[in-house]
Amino acid sequence: MRNLKILFSYLGAYRRDAILGVFFVSVETVLELFIPVIMANIIDVGVPAGDINYMLLQGAYMLVCAALSLVLGLGYACTSARVASGLGANLREAEYKKIQTLAFGNLDNYDASSLVTRMTTDITVIQNAVGNGFRPMVRGPVTLIVGLIYALMLSRPLATVFAIILPVLAIVLGAITYRVSPLYRQLQTSMDHLNGVVQEDLTAVRAVKAYVRAEHEEAKFDTVNTELAGTATKTFGSAVLNLPVFQLSMYVAALSILWIGGRMILAGKLGVGSLTGFMSYVLLIMNSLMMISNVFLLLTRALTSVGRIAEVLDEEPFIANPAGDLAIAAPADGSIEFRDVSFKYRADAAEDVLQHIDLRIESGSTVGILGGTGSGKSSLVQLIARLYDATEGAVLVGGRDVRDYDLAALRDAVGIVLQKNVLFTGTVRENLQWGNPQASDDELLAACRAACVDEFLDRIGGLDGELGQGSAGVSGGQKQRLCIARTLLKHPRVLIFDDSTSAVDMATDAKIREHIARIPDATVLIIAQRIASVMDADRIVVLDDGRVHGVGTHEELLAGDNIYQEIYASQMEFARNADAGDGSDDGCANDPFSSVACGSPLEGGERHA
């Protein structure tokens, strides 16, 4: 019942069309049901009396009823099309807007393929149910009720047959609906799995071809495709059981009525015209019951889809703006403080990703962050922009808790280049203007120079060059530089680079850092794998297993932090081997800290890898 209320609540401006559609179908049905009464009058009154005028008049009434039914049917077709398409558009818009409000923590609960399926396949199922089921949804009950009334008017004894047939059909329909309802949910889940495999393969098609894994991916696809086919067979195999049951019931009812009616005619208790008219109502009533059963099955599947969409719409964002006018407009400066911060991605996780972090970063300073894989580097900086909320403790920016800020204002003040760089389909200009929609071409080019994008900008068509889906035609390093330029255009108080230069060479990395160092009053946090990328920072933070292991300058950590010493020694050893020509190319030999790019140990030793 709740899912039906949700469905009706999103009709919006199309409620008027829905009401008109109900009116058109109801009147059309009543007119069509009146035709058998006219036909019975012609047979029982006009034919025995030989009254041609009476028969012509009744025939004219039939034509009028048929013509009005046609007009009303056309009116319904227009209104139902608007209702179905409008409802689908409203649901898609509501779900898309809801997704935009959800925090990373909310989105972690859903696969991207599942969200896409809900916005496409599930909404198409609802549209089909409304478009194809709206007419029988109204026509079926109206035909059943009015048909039974007319049947009772013609012959009460014959109408008692329906008292036996209707309960049997209701029980059968209830059993089938109970059976297929969970199967429809399984069907949509199987569709999620199929879409997930297809989406992943299309996104990673270059890797699939590079590693010659087409056969492996085909086997994965066959598995989910077979799963979907099996679920669909089981679901629709159960759903179609209603057809033979209803047909059998219709034949039994017709034979019973003909047998009882024939005996009544022989006894002089019923006219032939009345029996003919009654048989018309039998067919109409049984067809209405079949319509109702099909509508039930359509609704069962549609309401399953509504339930899946409602799961997203009902999701409470883990992160929300402060209530009322309490939100702070912008940070006073770029200072950052972590006060006994612990964090885990899921409430039921066994261990914290970050544990009791105490750290203060002065406004305008440059801080490097190093640590092994899984040490919590990315998790730490994502708390600053409030992409996630700390599980315990508090994160402060500009001296105030990040939870006190207006979300948009905080994220405008904190520019973060994420580890996974994303560019959107469109021109270079359109992508850069994500950082500042009002930026002039001069500002765009200045940001490009700061991020060393100017070195390749002309090769990709300049600011008006088109970037294809998935940034086709742009290398990993070029994508990183474009994302850095986009972030610089925000002119944020805090700049965070989450391993954002891992795909660029050392010379370009140094140029970018030099440009960033010239930005006045900006607090800069650099997560890096290469010590060379952070050794000139004011301070370097070393993380280990979610805890702060050491804080200091390059020289201080080199003298007193064993993890930093291991990372440094590992990278220096690789650099010496590269200089000696131990299997490395010239590019690596000239890059004393390019361990990531050249395939050496990332973070110094097995313990931290």
Locations of regions flagged by a protein language model:
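An intracellular "coupling" helix at the cytosolic face of ABC transporter transmembrane type-1 domains
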Residues: 13-16, 101-105, 121-130, 134, ...
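Transmembrane helices of ABC transporter permease
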Residues: 13, 17-30, 34, 41, ...
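Membrane-integrated ABC transporters
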Residues: 1-32, 39, 47-63, 72, ...
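ABC-type nucleotide-binding domain
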Residues: 329-609
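Pre-NBD coupling/linker segments of ABC/ABC-like ATPases
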Residues: 317-331
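Alpha-helical transmembrane segments of multi-pass membrane proteins
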Residues: 17-18, 65-84, 135-142, 163-190, ...
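Helix-loop-helix
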Residues: 51-57, 146, 150-164, 234-308, ...
